[in-house]
Structure formats: structure tokens, C-alpha cells
Amino acid sequence: MEELLFRHSPEKQIIAKLILSKASIMRTKYMHFLSSVSTVLLIVLLSTFSSAQEKKELTIVTFGNSTTAPRKGIEKVYAVRIHEALTEAGIPNKVINSGVGSNHTGSVKDNDRPKIEHGMDRFEKAVLSHHPDWVTLNFGLNDAYQDKGDGTASRIPLEAFIANLTHFITEIKKNNGRVILLTPNPLSSKLEPFRHERLKLYKDAVIKLAKSEHVELINSWKVFGKYARKNPGGMEGLMPDGLHPMDTGHKLIADEIVKIIKKRNR
């Protein structure tokens, strides 16, 4: 085509050259445009991929009694330790401590010692409203407690205790959360033998329930017992008041919880 155009008069040749030059410029601009579009698309794709690769922040609720709640004399309860350990491991997380002292699993209508909201009363607000990925359930000490001494009824009967925990587990699962059941921690020798015997029934029930409901389990009796056998002070060193774990006990529990979450979060 170019040869045919150049056979004409000089004026036409000039016009032809201008046309060819303009076409060349337009072609160059078009190529630059395509290159720019490709670059933008690549950036968008890389950004999308990068966002997809970012780890989701886990929401963890620790639901329980005074062995979960912040407590005077404890530097870091296990909820705090969980957050720190997961953060250090590169797992974004938010830990909500929903432990309340003297709580049992039931309602204040079931047993009003003390007259506060108990597990069933506050479950919706304290747990489900946070849409948790993980929930730890740590009850039993107050449920099993016999206010009138040896041979008398527990605050929450064993069957009701199991039913309450089952309700918590079912509702958490319905809301796409995962459950870690903790047995109540053991008692030290400061507490009467009959209290150990009654609490053991509740501990055994938690172990059985975790198996039947296919949820994670931390056997605090086993964890604390192993530590007590290897360290001076034994169980009394873990729980000076006979009931509530000090910082070492909270660290033991936190380590077990973190181990489970890290394993399941891969």
C-alpha cells in the first residue's frame, strides 16, 4: 500500500506520509494503553490474592467462673495468655473474657447462690453475641459445691450440669463456633475429701460429654496433676487457697488451649 501511495504527486505523497505517521502514533498509544491496563489488572489480581492470603482474626470467648475471670493476685489469667501466645505465633485474635466469679452453669432461678446472673442467664450476651470462632467452657466448681456439707445436694445437680453444658455446645455449634471443654480444676488438700469426691463426678461427666459431643477437651485434673507431681509445693503450690489456680495454673491452661487452636487453625 505504501508503494502505491508514493507513486502519486508530491502533495499526495506528503498527505500519505502524514496518514501513515498518525496511524503509527495511534498504534503506539494503543500499545501503551494495553500495557497500562495489563499492569493495573496485575496489581488488582496481586492485591486480591494478598488479601485472600491474610489470616482471619479469630474471636475467642472464655466462658466460665472465677477460675476464668480476672482475679486479684493473678498477673495474667489464661484469657490474656491465650491472646499473647497466639499473637506471637502470628495468628490475629481477639479474646473476650466472659468469666464471672461464683458462676454455675444454670440460672439464678435454679440456684441463687449468689444472686447474680449465672451461665444460662448470660450465655446469649456473654458468648453468642460475639459470634465466636472458639469458646472455652470452664464450669463445675460451683455446680458441684455442697453448701450444707457432706452428703447434701450440689448447687446444680449433675444431670442438670450435663444438660446445661450440652445446651451451650449445641448453640455454639449452630453458630459455627468450636468448643473446648475444660474439666473443673482439682482441689488441693485444704478442701474436705467429700468435696473432692463430688467434684470428681462432675469432672468425669465433662470428659464423657466431650467425647459424645465430639468437641475438644482439656482435662485440668490431668494437667495439674502432672505438674504437681514434678514440682515442689504440689497442688497447694498451684492453688494456695485450695480452689483457685495462681499464675502457674493459668499458664498451664493457656498452653493447652493455644496448642489446640494452633493445631486446628492450620
Question: What are the residue ranges of the model-derived segments?
Answer:
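Charged, glycine-enriched surface loops/patches
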Residues: 153-182, 205-215
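Catalytic His-Asp segment of secreted/periplasmic serine-dependent ester chemistry enzymes
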Residues: 184-266
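Conserved SGNH/GDSL esterase-like catalytic core that processes O-acyl groups on lipids
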Residues: 55-62, 67-163
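Active-site segments of SGNH/GDSL-like serine hydrolases
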Residues: 138-145, 168-201
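Amphipathic, non-transmembrane alpha-helical secondary structure
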Residues: 120-128, 159-166, 170, 251, ...
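Sec-exported extracytoplasmic/periplasmic mature domains
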Residues: 87-88, 128, 132, 140, ...
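N-terminal secretory targeting modules
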Residues: 1-63, 67-76, 80-93, 128-131, ...
